[in-house]
Amino acid sequence: RRKELPPACLSSELRSPQMRDIQKLIPAEAIVYGRLPLMITENCLVQNETGCHLSEAGDAVPQQAPCRKPNDLQDRTGAKFPLLPAYGHRTEIQNSAPVWLADKPEWKHCGLTYARLRFTTEAPAECADIFRAYQTGAPASGPFTRGLYYRGVD
């Protein structure tokens, strides 16, 4: 008897034809909106800056920790990279611009089981606006990236 597998979230480094090939084997989803993680640091960057001491809290990040507040890194061009708390009191550095594919119909023809909208730093009203934009295929209203969906990785 064959069991159903839950959908796997595909790598954002895959191009559309590669996604189409994988979905033939397993149910698949892809992130079609959101800030993608660039790296996870071994240490909490906010702790290094503010000196928050959470050793008594263990590996989980408490709700009131300074790293739960909006923090970012800024590069020399002024781009801001949001910092999200990660398990083990690490930091997940997000891309400065979200992936935006609402106005690109190609992802709808890859055979994906689901399309994931990855909300990380957005306010609730902004999440609703983005959801509606994806329903209508609207272009982005701010800075965005297409990720690697069209370029891929060598």
Task: Give the location of each predicted region.
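Active-site pocket-lining/capping segments in soluble small-molecule metabolic enzymes
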Residues: R1-D154
